[in-house]
């Protein structure tokens, strides 16, 4: 029997940092108290840069001064294999887009959906 090919999920993930060093987290679901790093799944054949910029546009009210790929990681997740493109964005402003957003000190992040993984992603992007 041939093993089945795993589902592969491609994700653009952003660590958005203000000049004062705070990072942006968003709430994708109003009934969930946990926070997320901004990010979205890529559409088929979409370039990660394009999805990252679209995610930033949906945040709204945040003006980037720099934008670039920081690192790529892959791991087995609950829904198959994940390939995550982590972007570092220097920006300022008040998020006013599709989802609630707030700025937090990187060393004092609130409860996040993925816990230690998000904290480690922030650390790696900002180092």
Identify what each model region corresponds to.
Residues 33, 88, 95-127:
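NUDIX/MutT-family hydrolases
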Residues 40, 54, 67, 104-107:
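Structural detector for helix-capping/boundary residues
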Residues 57, 61-93:
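Active-site segment of metal-dependent pyrophosphate-handling enzymes
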């Amino acid at each position: 029997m041939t093993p089945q090919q795993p589902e592969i999920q491609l994700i653009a993930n952003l660590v958005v940092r203000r000049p004062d060093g705070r990072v942006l987290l968003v709430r994708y679901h109003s009934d969930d108290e946990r926070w997320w790093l901004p990010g979205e799944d890529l559409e088929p054949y979409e370039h990660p840069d394009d999805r990252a910029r679209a995610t930033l546009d949906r945040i709204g009210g945040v003006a980037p001064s720099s934008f670039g790929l920081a690192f790529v990681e892959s791991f087995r997740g609950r829904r198959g294999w994940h390939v995550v493109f982590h972007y570092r964005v220097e920006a300022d402003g008040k998020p006013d887009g599709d989802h609630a957003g707030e700025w937090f000190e990187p060393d004092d992040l609130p409860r996040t959906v993925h816990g230690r993984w998000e904290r480690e992603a922030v650390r790696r992007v900002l180092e």
